[in-house]
């Protein structure tokens, strides 16, 4: 009887190992998807950490997944399953994209998306006097009618190139924000020409700086300028 039970346990173990082996034989996620989120005004849309995303929904599945964009408006995911996906950019400071497209994602799949930003930051200049940084720029709106209210504008200052909302030094960034709370159509030309000042930068340090304009859409999203390097003399 003991021998019979022992043989039974051996057979059960073999069947279990065989079943596990079959499961492990399935291909892993080896497809990739990359591209650019392009501004209709030209160039890549400047984004920030955790803002703009590419939303993907695999055909036949109900739960979507997302690919976060990088600060320079590029995106990439190298661990996707080969399949057809419904794809749309979302979450950024641009007019909502309502039409999804279907992309057959395999190894090395590339696709770019063009969006219309809420606000375009133009003529962005920086000047440093001692430890005080002055930032000047103007704002325009490709589509003014129906634009979400402009809440505020502010500098973003950090010691790394990863600089933006959620990635900045508060004492140089948030405290120097300027409240606007106006519709773009109610702003004068003077309102649209903005000057920000960042005082008391640390001598001998290098900073990375950009500006942003925040709107009252459902994401509280911001449009950003490019990132510039500021070297403060000792």
Protein language model features and the residues they cover:
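Short, acidic Ser/Thr/Gly-rich low-complexity loop/linker segments typical of extracellular
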Residues: 59-72
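Extracellular fibronectin type III
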Residues: 217-234
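Short Pro-Gly-centered beta-turn/loop motif in secreted/extracellular proteins
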Residues: 76-86, 92-93
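Glycine-centered loop-to-beta-strand initiation motif
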Residues: 35, 69-78, 113
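Bacterial Sec-dependent N-terminal signal peptides
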Residues: 1-42, 233-234
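Short, ordered, surface-exposed loop/turn motifs in non-cytosolic proteins
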Residues: 41-60, 147-151
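Structured interaction patches on ligand/partner-binding surfaces of diverse proteins
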Residues: 92-118
